C-alpha cells in the first residue's frame, strides 16, 4: 500500500474526540421523555436498553466489536458491555470537556453522525446514550481503552464525578450501567426478560456473526445458575426465516432463497421461503429497525417478486388455463420472508415513524430481487413449479373468498339494519366513546347485558366456536357465522383504494373492542382464537389501538362486611394476611359466577376496571407465536406452554 493509502486508512479508522459531533442539548428530555423514546410505559423502559445496545451494534457493524453482554441486575438496573473500541475519553475542543462526557450529556452527540466513524447506524429514535442518562437516577460508564480503565458516574443526566482513571487493562470496550428513574417511568421500572430476549434474538439474526448474551440476576434456574440466553447466528436472515417457519406449515421449496448484495450503494439482504400455510409473513428492517408500516424497500421487494414470478409462470405456460387474473396478493400467500437494508441517511415517515421513505431504496431492492430470483427459478425448476402451483391455488381461493365476502358485505349494506340479532347495541352513535364487549357464552352475555352502561357499551355474545384462522382458507372464514357477525357488528369491511386486503376502518362503530372471557385457562383459548383472527385479518385494529382484553378478578376475599377483589394469587395472599382470621376466599371460574353489579364494578366500569391493550411490539415474534399456538405442530406448542405456564391462571 502507498503512503497516501496508509494515511487515508489511518484517518478512517481513528476514532477520537474529533469524530464526536454535537447536534443539540439535553434539557428537554426529562420534561418531555415520550418525544425522545416513544412513551414512558413498558415500551419506553425497554427502549432505554435498545439505545445502549444500538451503540454497541454500530461498533460491530463498523467491524470493531464481536460480543455484547446485557445483564438485568437484581435491582432492575441494566448493564450493557461490549468489546468495541471504547467511547473516546480525550478532550473535546469545541465542547471544552471529555468526549465521554459529551456523548453522555449532549443529545445527538456521537460518532454515528460522523460518516468516517460509522457508515450506517441503528436505532429508531437515535437519541443515544445521553437520553438514557437523562432518564436514569444512576448511570456509570466504564471505558477500557488505551491500556487504561476510565470511569464516570451520573445522576439524571448530570455528572456526579469527573472522568477518573481507576486502573489498567489489556482489553478494550464500553460498559454502561444505568437505573431508570421511577419518577419518570411511573407505570413500571421492572424489565421483562422475554421482551429483551426477543429483541436480542432479532438483532443476532439481523447482524450475523455477533455474539449477544442476556443474563437475568433476578432469577435462577433449577441448577442455581442465573437465567440467561446466548444469541448468535452464522447465517443471519436464512436462520431468521427458519426460526419463523419452524411453527408454520410444511415448506414447499427445498431451500431458502437467499440474497446478500449491494445495489446503488445500498446493502440489501433478503431470505424467503414458501410454505403451505395461507398467510403472508413478510418482515422488513432498515438499519435493524423493524419497519412495521413498510416503506420503499418493501415496495421494491413486492414489485420484483410479483413481476419476476408472473413472467416465469407465463413463460412456462402454467397460467394458460386460468380463467381470472392473478394479483400481487396471490404471490405472497404462504410466503415467509425477511427484507433487511442498510441506509446511510434513512427518512422515516408514517404514524409510528417506521415507514421508510427513501425512493432510491425501492429501485435497489427491486434490482437485487429481480436478478437473484430469476437465477433461482431458472436453476431450480422443481421449486419454481411448486411456487407457481401455490400461487394458482391462492388465486383460486381468493376468487372464491371474494365472492363469499361480497355476498356478506353486500347483504349488510343492502339490508340497512343488518346488525346481528344477538348484538345488544349501545344507544350512543359517538364512536369515540362507544365500546363493544365480545363475551363468550350466553349466560355471561346475559349478565354483561344487565351490568353494562347501555349508553356507550354494546355486548356481543359468541355462542359457537370461532374458526381457527391459522388453519383455514379465506373463503371458509366468510362462511363462519360468528366471524360474519363480528364483521357486521364492527361495521368494518375489507378493501381500500390503496390495498385490496387492508381493513377499511371508515365505518368502524366502536373505539374500544374488548375481548371478555372467563379468567381460567380453557377459556383463554377462545381469547387466543379471537386474537389470531384480529392479528391475521384485522391487524389495523390492533395497530390503531382499538383492541383490549378485559381482566376479570380471580378471587373475592370476604370478612364480615368487607369485600376485596384480587387479580393475582400474590394479591390474594397479601390481602388474606392483612385481613387476618375468619377470611373466606371465593375463586371465580367464570364470568357467570358474578352478578351484574359485581361484573360492572370489577370488569366493565371504566373508573375501576383493568383493561389490557393489545399491541404488536415485535411483529415477527408475534407472528411466530400465533403460528405455533394455533398451527399443527404440537412439540413447539407444548414447549412454549411449559415455559410460560407460570404466567397462566391454571385451575388445578
Where are these regions (language model features)?
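GHKL-family ATPase ATP-binding module
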Residues: 1-19, 26, 50, 58-60, ...
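Surface-exposed acidic, glycine/proline-enriched linker/cap segments
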Residues: 103-105, 109-115, 301, 476-491
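C-terminal interaction appendages of subunits in large macromolecular complexes
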Residues: 396-415, 430-436, 446, 450-452, ...
Amino acid at each position: 500500500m502507498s503512503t497516501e493509502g496508509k494515511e487515508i486508512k489511518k484517518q478512517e479508522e481513528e476514532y477520537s474526540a474529533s469524530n464526536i459531533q454535537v447536534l443539540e442539548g439535553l434539557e428537554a428530555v426529562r420534561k418531555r421523555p415520550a418525544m425522545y423514546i416513544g412513551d414512558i410505559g413498558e415500551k419506553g423502559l425497554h427502549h432505554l436498553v435498545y439505545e445502549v445496545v444500538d451503540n454497541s451494534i454500530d461498533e460491530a457493524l463498523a467491524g470493531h466489536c464481536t460480543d455484547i453482554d446485557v445483564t438485568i441486575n437484581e435491582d432492575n438496573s441494566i448493564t450493557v458491555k461490549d468489546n468495541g473500541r471504547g467511547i473516546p475519553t480525550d478532550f473535546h475542543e469545541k465542547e471544552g470537556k471529555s468526549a465521554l462526557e459529551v456523548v453522555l450529556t449532549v443529545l445527538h452527540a456521537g460518532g454515528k453522525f460522523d460518516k468516517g466513524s460509522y457508515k450506517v447506524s441503528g436505532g429508531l429514535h437515535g437519541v443515544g446514550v445521553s437520553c438514557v442518562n437523562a432518564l436514569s437516577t444512576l448511570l456509570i460508564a466504564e471505558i477500557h481503552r488505551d491500556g487504561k480503565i476510565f470511569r464516570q458516574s451520573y445522576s439524571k443526566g448530570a455528572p456526579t464525578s469527573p472522568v477518573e482513571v481507576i486502573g489498567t487493562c489489556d482489553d478494550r470496550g464500553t460498559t454502561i450501567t444505568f437505573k431508570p428513574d421511577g419518577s419518570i417511568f411511573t407505570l413500571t421500572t421492572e424489565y421483562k426478560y422475554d421482551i429483551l430476549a426477543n429483541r436480542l434474538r432479532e438483532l443476532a439474526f439481523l447482524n450475523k456473526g455477533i455474539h449477544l448474551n442476556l443474563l437475568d440476576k433476578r432469577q435462577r434456574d433449577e441448577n442455581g445458575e442465573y437465567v440467561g440466553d446466548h444469541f448468535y447466528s452464522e447465517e443471519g436472515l436464512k436462520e431468521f426465516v427458519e426460526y419463523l417457519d419452524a411453527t408454520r406449515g410444511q415448506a414447499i421449496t427445498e431451500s431458502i432463497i437467499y440474497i446478500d448484495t449491494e445495489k446503488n450503494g445500498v446493502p440489501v439482504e433478503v431470505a424467503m421461503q414458501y410454505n403451505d400455510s395461507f398467510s403472508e409473513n413478510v418482515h422488513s428492517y432498515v438499519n435493524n429497525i423493524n419497519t412495521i408500516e413498510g416503506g420503499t424497500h418493501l415496495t421494491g421487494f413486492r414489485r420484483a417478486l410479483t413481476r419476476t414470478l408472473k413472467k416465469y409462470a407465463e413463460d412456462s405456460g402454467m397460467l394458460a388455463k386460468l380463467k381470472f387474473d392473478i394479483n400481487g396478493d396471490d404471490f405472497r400467500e404462504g410466503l415467509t420472508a425477511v427484507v433487511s437494508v442498510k441506509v446511510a441517511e434513512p427518512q422515516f415517515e408514517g404514524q409510528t415513524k417506521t415507514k421508510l421513505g427513501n425512493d432510491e431504496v425501492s429501485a435497489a431492492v427491486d434490482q437485487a430481487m429481480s436478478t437473484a430470483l430469476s437465477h433461482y427459478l431458472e436453476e431450480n425448476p422443481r421449486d419454481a413449479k411448486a411456487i407457481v402451483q401455490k400461487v394458482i391455488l391462492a388465486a383460486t381461493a381468493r376468487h372464491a373468498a371474494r365472492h363469499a365476502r361480497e355476498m356478506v358485505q353486500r347483504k349488510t349494506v343492502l339490508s340497512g339494519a343488518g346488525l346481528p340479532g344477538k348484538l345488544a347495541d349501545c344507544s350512543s352513535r359517538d364512536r369515540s366513546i362507544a365500546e363493544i364487549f365480545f363475551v363468550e357464552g350466553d349466560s355471561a352475555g346475559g349478565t354483561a347485558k344487565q351490568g353494562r352502561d347501555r349508553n356507550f357499551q354494546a355486548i356481543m355474545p359468541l355462542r359457537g366456536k370461532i374458526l381457527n384462522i391459522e388453519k383455514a382458507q379465506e373463503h371458509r372464514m366468510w362462511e363462519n357465522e360468528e366471524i360474519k357477525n363480528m364483521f357486521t357488528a364492527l361495521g368494518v369491511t375489507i378493501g381500500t383504494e390503496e390495498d385490496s386486503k387492508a381493513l377499511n376502518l371508515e365505518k368502524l362503530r366502536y373505539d374500544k373492542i374488548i375481548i371478555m372471557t372467563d379468567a381460567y385457562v380453557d377459556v383463554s383459548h377462545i381469547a387466543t382464537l379471537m386474537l389470531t383472527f384480529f392479528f391475521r385479518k384485522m391487524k389495523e385494529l390492533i395497530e390503531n389501538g382499538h383492541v383490549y382484553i378485559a381482566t376479570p378478578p380471580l378471587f373475592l376475599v370476604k370478612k364480615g362486611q368487607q369485600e376485596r377483589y384480587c387479580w393475582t394469587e400474590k394479591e390474594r395472599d397479601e390481602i388474606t394476611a392483612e385481613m387476618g382470621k375468619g377470611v373466606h376466599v371465593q375463586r371465580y371460574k367464570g364470568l357467570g359466577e358474578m352478578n351484574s353489579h359485581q361484573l360492572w364494578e370489577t370488569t366493565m366500569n371504566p373508573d375501576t376496571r383493568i383493561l389490557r391493550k393489545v399491541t404488536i411490539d415485535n411483529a415477527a415474534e408475534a407472528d411466530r407465536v400465533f403460528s405455533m399456538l394455533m398451527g399443527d405442530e404440537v412439540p413447539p406448542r407444548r414447549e412454549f406452554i411449559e415455559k410460560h405456564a407460570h404466567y397462566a391462571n391454571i385451575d388445578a
